[in-house]
Amino acid sequence: MRILVRGGSIAAGVGVSRGYADLLRERYAPLGVEVVNRSRPGETSFDAVETFAADIEPHRPDILVVHFGIDDAFSSVYRSEFKENLVRIVRLARRRLSAAVVLPTSHLLPDPHERAAVDVYYRTIREVAADLACEMVPVHTAWAGYCTDRGPAGSAFLQADPRLPDEEGHGLYATFLAVRLDRLL
């Protein structure tokens, strides 16, 4: 069994020594599940479509985690393009690999204007997941619930650049994703 993570800066673990893909690898290795991370800093959904044959297909994942949104939002990828790219990735994964596809959102951003900008992308992820029967992991809502229950400030679990989670934030990502991944394994 193989899980492949394909995303941008967050999935690549920018700014931390162990990102959520590393934590998932540690969690699932004893079960014989391989976790491969083919994410790169700053990449958008356009990059994932363009490199599907090189980054995803050769690994033949059983589960594909497609984690884009924040880099797209701040790289001027239009919402319509983002949606089209996600649809293309899902269809390629199903046609060429028969892989289950997991679409996570990202964390809440503390700045209300930036949060509103990425919320459009999170809604798009929800639409694609519903339309194409993918597994969606609403990290942003789980994150909000976690912070509400435990009382940390909105910028808790984030690096100096609030678009990136810190090590503890990556732990939250891994926890939220594992709930869905456990059901697929």
Predicted regions and their residues:
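Serine-esterase "nucleophile elbow" of acetyl-processing enzymes
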Residues: M1-P41, F46, T51-R60
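Alpha-helical cap/lid subdomain in secreted, periplasmic
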Residues: D22-L31, V49-L185
